[in-house]
């Protein structure tokens, strides 16, 4: 059995839209990541209670680590839920 000699075209490349880190930008310079600031931390948590990925949020490596640590501390102190209450 010989393979058919039809060649596939490569898919057109989609332009990659890079997001800037909010905390590194000028308007976020004076904003600190604190585990007690649940309103800020909720923006980085999915509906299921998981911490959103860095490629989704657009944060830099250092600030994504700080967000993860703050979320984990807030969960420990019961300021944020460990998981979503809906099933």
UniProtKB/Swiss-Prot annotation:
Keyword entries, A-Z: Ribonucleoprotein, Ribosomal protein, RNA-binding, rRNA-binding
Job of this protein: Binds as a heterodimer with protein bS6 to the central domain of the 16S rRNA, where it helps stabilize the platform of the 30S subunit.
HAMAP family (UniProt xref): Ribosomal_bS18
Domain of life: Bacteria
GO process terms (BP): translation
Protein name in the entry: Small ribosomal subunit protein bS18B
Region forming the signal peptide: none
Pfam families membership: Ribosomal_S18 (PF01084)
Family per record: Belongs to the bacterial ribosomal protein bS18 family.
Single GO term (MF): small ribosomal subunit rRNA binding
Subunit annotation: Part of the 30S ribosomal subunit. Forms a tight heterodimer with protein bS6.
Source organism: Mycolicibacterium vanbaalenii (strain DSM 7251 / JCM 13017 / BCRC 16820 / KCTC 9966 / NRRL B-24157 / PYR-1) (Mycobacterium vanbaalenii)
Gene name for this UniProt entry: rpsR2
Annotated Gene Ontology cellular component terms: cytosolic small ribosomal subunit
